[in-house]
């Protein structure tokens, strides 16, 4: 797993990409840019070619309802596969896990998700996800 950047908060807590697949909704990946993170990305290495059909996304910081509303959430995302093809999606602004389906099942060895636009949080200008699960048909 890789990312364009990640946030380290004032207490030294690092919000790295590995937080996206740890099974814990109270952890997260946040981009570490000085702005809202447009163009930032996170990349899942699938460990070989897998056939993927979509993903399940826990958008924003699910530590609590309060923290979810205070941080930015992704609105528009671009998903890129290892062959360079891309698909775009608009996520909802709800604290519910969202299933995203690709146009067709795709053989790929990586899935990269790029932030294209956001829903603004009430306090913090960082954007992230608590969990992302790649749906593998292999």
What are these regions (language model features)?
Residues 45, 53-58, 80, 114:
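Beta-strand residues in well-ordered beta-sheet regions across diverse protein folds
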Residues 13-18, 27-29, 49-53, 84-86, ...:
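N-terminal start-of-chain detector that recognizes signal peptides
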Residues 6, 15, 61-63, 119:
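Sequence-level detector for tyrosine residue identity
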Residues 1-45:
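Disordered, acidic Ser/Thr/Pro-rich linker "stalks" and the adjacent N-terminal cap
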Residues 21-23, 32-33, 56-58, 89-90, ...:
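Residue-level signal for well-ordered alpha-helical segments
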Residues 50-68:
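A short beta-strand element within beta-rich, extracytoplasmic domains
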Residues 36-41, 63-138:
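Trp- and acidic/polar-enriched beta-sheet ligand-binding modules for extracellular glycan
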